[in-house]
Regions:
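Bacterial Sec-dependent signal peptides at the C-terminal "C-region" and cleavage site
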Residues: 20-24
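Bacterial N-terminal signal peptides that target proteins for export
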Residues: 1-10
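Bacterial N-terminal signal peptides
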Residues: 9-19
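Subset of outer-membrane beta-barrel
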Residues: 25-358
């Protein structure tokens, strides 16, 4: 037991030093600063309205609730790709989890990337001396990408047969082509308790508050500040407040069928007024999902998510649908979601994920 706690201390120690160092610096609040991760992990969860804190039990648990990694029994690998806004925004997720048989613990590594690629950089296509476009401007146009990335290192174990817990060390990187980038870090923690067929889960994302450090490469802007009269932006430090996720799930066997229901509530502390349920600066985001599985082979799913309001206080709820197939050690899942409210013109999201156990 003593060795176990020493391992946890060594795992957390570098990040605790970062937090102490950051406390001496000035940070501005970053509303929606970690929202690129809200896309999630795995198409199964999307089909269930992202209600997954209590029922997650595979490699994707590193995102939904790291305590769920304690259920991983063999090497578990997952990959997911999705596109939004007519393919403009791409999202990729990959993860691997490995159980440590001797200690009944699991370690995992996850990677997330959301980006817009092939953006035209037209700055050098402008002749600043003539104040006109250059001849053959296409020869001066370069392409760049804007991307948000995250790396999550996870550890989970069981405190008892009913109780499991897990922690994440998270590193994020935002890159705006060659012009600017930011690095950030935080810790997540989660617990899950099982009572028969009922599970209760709690997950605190960015438990330590995410600290992000921006830097701008002013050399990339040349003398455009003098030409256009625009002020070149400067880097600043940002902080992202914690998010508290709570969920409950219940499963019931009905002959060859297994029926699973889940309900989650996400509590954010960023004064998000677009959500229907608010209490001061705290917003409450409910998620509900239902899954029916036949002989542990074929699954159909449905859910509700994104309860929002518009300027006229009209309430909108986004429905989700999904399906999954399990063939030996291969899991293929599909999820579908529609943008709600005033964003319906932005289309729908189709998500496919693949998971393999070895």
């Amino acid at each position: 037991m003593k060795l176990f706690f020493m391992r946890i201390l060594l795992f957390l120690l570098p990040f605790l030093f970062f937090v102490i160092d950051a406390s001496a610096q000035s940070f501005s609040g970053a509303k929606y600063g970690g929202d690129f991760l809200s896309v999630g992990a795995g198409a199964r969860a999307l089909g269930m309205g992202s209600a997954h804190v209590a029922i997650t039990n595979d490699v994707t648990s590193a995102y939904w609730n790291p305590a769920g990694l304690a259920d991983v029994q063999s090497l578990d690998i997952a990959y997911m790709h999705s596109e939004r806004f007519a393919g403009i925004v791409s999202y990729d997720y990959g993860a691997v989890a490995y159980p440590l048989k001797e200690s009944e613990s699991t370690i995992a590594l996850s990677f997330f990337r959301q980006g817009v690629d092939n953006i035209a950089n037209t700055l050098n296509a402008w002749d600043r001396d003539r104040n006109l476009p250059r001849e053959n401007p296409e020869d001066y146009i370069e392409q760049f990408s804007v991307a948000d990335m995250a790396f999550i290192f996870s550890y989970a174990t069981r405190a008892s047969k009913e109780l499991s817990w897990g922690v994440n060390a998270k590193i994020v990187n935002h890159r705006l082509g060659p012009f600017a980038d930011a690095w950030g870090y935080s810790l997540d923690a989660g617990v899950r308790y099982q009572m028969g067929n009922t599970r209760v889960g709690v997950h605190v994302m960015d438990l330590t508050t995410m600290m992000k450090f921006w830097s701008v490469d002013e050399a990339e802007f040349g003398d455009f500040e003098e030409t256009f009269g625009d002020e070149i932006p400067s880097g600043q430090n940002e902080r992202v407040l914690p998010t508290l996720k709570m969920g409950v799930g219940h499963s019931r066997e009905l002959g060859d069928f297994t029926l699973t229901g889940a309900f989650d509530v996400d509590m954010r502390f960023e004064n998000r007024q677009a959500f229907f349920i608010n209490l001061g600066r705290i917003s409450f985001e409910p998620h509900a999902g239902l899954e029916g599985t036949y002989k542990n082979r074929l699954s159909l799913r449905m859910g509700l998510t994104d309860v929002t309001t518009d300027l006229n206080n009209q309430v909108y709820i986004s429905p989700t649908l999904g399906a999954g197939i399990h063939l030996n050690s291969v899991f293929i899942d599909y999820g579908f979601a529609n943008f709600g409210g005033g964003a319906t013109s932005l289309g729908v999201t189709h998500r496919i994920s693949l998971r393999v156990t070895i």
